[in-house]
Amino acid sequence: MRTWRLGLVAVVTGVVAGSLMAQPPLPDPSIGSISNSDAAAIKAFATYYANAMAATTDSSKMVQDRTAVLKPVHDTSHPASAIFMDAYGNAVNQAFIPLLGNAATSLNAIITIAQVHDMSTQPALEQALTNSNASVRYWAAKGLGDILGQLSALPPAYRQAVRHLEAALAVEKDPVVKMGIADALSQAASPSAKSAALAITALGSFASNYALVPPNNLPVCVGTIHAIEAMLNKGAVLTPEVQEQAMRSLARIMSFTAQYYQSGLLNRTQTLVAVDALKACGDAMDVITHSQKFSLAAIDPQTDKSQVLLTVNGLTGDTQEKGLLQELYPKVAAPARISGKP
């Protein structure tokens, strides 16, 4: 059997069935066909590292096992063939799925599966979207987003993946996972109106609590806004009601960010994120309105903070005066001041 030297020291790295075992040989990843013996060797290799991960409680050893599994996939100097990747992805999928049910191994297992970046891992990624661990759900969503392009060649599998992501986003509570699922859905070639509406609902949940915890919400707001903008740029269509919902949330985030920014309540890192948030809001609002009236591309961390707030007030409106937003969407009220109830 042809074997490929991984560049790893073939020493004992795991305990299987109570005995020490050396790393099994792996077929050359560049091979153009897979024999029965090749398939068996690939399965043995994946199973070996899954068993090694299951047999330890040392997170650093789990990371070593994960690295070993991913080396054939990520070695750009020796690219793996498509036929190898299909067999390898299936083997990793089957070997590591059982580890998703173990709290000690679930995170390293899903990171391993997600970073194979092959559509053969779809079943495990979909299953992990309902895991009790938020970090596992995040990586499951990321993994599915990364393979949506491959799955588009298989419409039934592609639609199934999108349905799983949409169902997950509809019930997800964790802000970071919401952002991750929205980003995954934005990787679709033609995002659906439902995907965009769900992402906008997620953004609305961030906006409703924004005045209470702005530093915590800023990164997830920015990530979700970018995902929504990507969906819209790819043709996702919003109903008038969802447009209003989106503009209301974006205006709220834009206004509250500008208020915190002007007040000096953000540290240096948060200030940089705030500038990104303001620009992201403006860009998304322009995409929704098919205009260039909300853009804040000209601002940067050196821009006078009071001037930024005045500019934003002119766009979103404030408690004293209506803004451009109310001219276009009369039903969308101006955002409240930070001192008021959001």
Regions found by a protein language model. Give the residues of each.
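Bacterial N-terminal signal peptides that target proteins for export
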Residues: 1-8
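Structural detector for internal amphipathic alpha-helices that build alpha-solenoid repeat scaffolds
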Residues: 31-38, 51-86, 104-118, 124-127, ...
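Amphipathic alpha-helical segments within extended alpha-helical solenoids and repeat-rich scaffolds
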Residues: 85-97, 159-172, 197-215, 243-267, ...
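Amphipathic alpha-helical scaffolding segments comprising HEAT/armadillo-like alpha-solenoid repeats
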Residues: 26-31, 36-53, 79-99, 118-130, ...
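Cleaved targeting-peptide boundary
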Residues: 20-31, 340-342
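Charge-dense, extended regions
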Residues: 323-342
